[in-house]
Amino acid sequence: MTSEVLQTISSGSGFAQPQSSSTLDHDESLINPPLVKKKRNLPGNPDPEAEVIALSPTTLMATNRFLCEVCGKGFQRDQNLQLHRRGHNLPWKLKQRTSKEVRKRVYVCPEKTCVHHHSSRALGDLTGIKKHFCRKHGEKKWTCEKCAKRYAVQSDWKAHSKTCGTREYRCDCGTIFSRRDSFITHRAFCDALAEETAKINAVSHLNGLAAAGAPGSVNLNYQYLMGTFIPPLQPFVPQPQTNPNHHHQHFQPPTSSSLSLWMGQDIAPPQPQPDYDWVFGNAKAASACIDNNNTHDEQITQNANASLTTTTTLSAPSLFSSDQPQNANANSNVNMSATALLQKAAEIGATSTTTAATNDPSTFLQSFPLKSTDQTTSYDSGEKFFALFGSNNNIGLMSRSHDHQEIENARNDVTVASALDELQNYPWKRRRVDGGGEVGGGGQTRDFLGVGVQTLCHPSSINGWI
């Protein structure tokens, strides 16, 4: 008998063979497909086809909106009221589930200034709109006994009370959080605020250094930048100026150089400048002013003697040259004596009808206003012959406070001084010759070309040369 049972089992005639579990699952999935879970709309993004309901704050916050007309008892839901009416033997009706889909309802916040007051930002359930109104616009009635934090929704207060004091997140600023997400949000904001504060403090510090002129500030060293373009000026003692605008004429760009006003034809028009009060000096070096004459008088005199003896650009042609830097000596290599200059001036051919210019020995020097070779513009700003002895940026050396004897010694060291002496004394020598003075009356020929002293000395004749 045992053998028969074994044969029956092996043949499968007496028992059904079990099916695999994978086959069963596949069959069940075909018979009952899984229900697709409908996703919930995000807060503030209602269904466009939903019914929008607007409730007043009183109705929204009422705890028992549904009241019994017999006993006056209130209920939160209409279903509860219907069940209560059944106890009073009143007609009652419960909502029946139907196959027809019920239209959705959305609720707007009664607060007009709230973003959820608009229908496009309505909330999808009545409980949600209640909690929103309590949290944002309601009174906070519940307070935590441990941390004294207040809440407007009772459920929020209960949830906080369960975790308060058990977990603690402390920020560097001293704020304590019990929730990690709140701590992370605050920490990001706090770090960004600290970074911005550090930037503002750094900028304020740099501005303070710049205003105070401290080393390392953003201010540039003007003397260092311009040192390669403007030669250093020797200190000098300035004299009072009558021109109120002379402070604005300290730095002038160098103009094109020329041999002289008589010989050069490419000279640029000179810039308007104030009157010069010294034979040797510069009225524009206000940046090197020294107010104390007694302290620096000896040093200034030594600098004047050294500069006059070593300057190579002050040759005779530079007596009538325009303003130029000290190193621009390309056109100053032609040396002419005072007699040659007078002969050249006489050959230009100016005439005069008056002899008043010969009465004053300084008239000759005062009759040389700077003029441009360009006949369309004339700069007659009172610059007399005294301004022509040197360049603007180099010879700010002499002043009226110097001793007369030291100035005379300095003049005798260079050709310019001898030329100036010859020019200043020429009218007097001529008058002595004509008047029969100490030289002798008419025995020798002094006027080489026969043009007369009047022609050379009158201001109009000088203007004719130029």
From Swiss-Prot:
Zn(2+) 1 binds at residues 144, 147, 160, 164. The modification Phosphoserine is found at residues 56, 178, 182. A zinc finger (CCHC-type) spans 169-192. Inhibition of transcription factor activity by KIN10-mediated phosphorylation at Thr-98, Ser-178 and Ser-182 under sugar deprivation conditions, thus delaying flowering. It is found in: Nucleus. GO terms for biological process: asymmetric cell division; leaf senescence; photoperiodism, flowering; positive regulation of DNA-templated transcription; protein localization to nucleus; regulation of DNA-templated transcription; regulation of meristem growth; regulation of timing of transition from vegetative to reproductive phase. This is Zinc finger protein NUTCRACKER. It comes from Arabidopsis thaliana (Mouse-ear cress).
